[in-house]
Amino acid sequence: LGSFVPDLDNFVVAYATLAKLPTEGIHRTATHSVFFVAATVLVFYLIGQWRKDVRWVNLGIGLGLGNLLHSLLDMLVWFNGVNLFWPLGGEINFWANITPPEWFMKFMDPAEFLFFGIYLWVLGSWARKYNTDKDFAAKHRMWMMIEFALFVIFTPLVYIMTKGFLTIFGALYLFSITTAFLVTIRMRKTIEAAEA
């Protein structure tokens, strides 16, 4: 779950876009920061102490690690910087002096759907391997196929649409990240079986 948290800032970007507010400095800042990670771990640690339940502490550590791994992966894979120490500034961009081809940068948007599809495929493989979440298999398969279909549909669209692509893509991206987040929660038995 923690690896989804940093990109939930896209909901704020969407709101700002719809409200005609500036979107600069929203994505890959606060939710990608090590201070956000530390705050997440601390909040869940305090809840765990208050409730006297180590599961809350473990959840906070898991969310924090997932969040941190996401931010580090963004720095390695995307060609945009990450404000790892927000609000102190100092965007880190390993690729600052490299200009990737335009076709590749465009491809990165529909590739998000491909990666959601692969993630859901892995969950399904684990569910079959560990014989878990059988009652959710059909719905899971449907969500996975939707993600692969979105990838197939949006790959040519990113190259041929001159206006409106990011609005449609953004709405479906928010739908996809929400779906992946909820499917992950729904299939927690599968994830727990894979971790054992």
Where are these regions (language model features)?
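N-terminal membrane-targeting hydrophobic helices
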Residues: 1-196
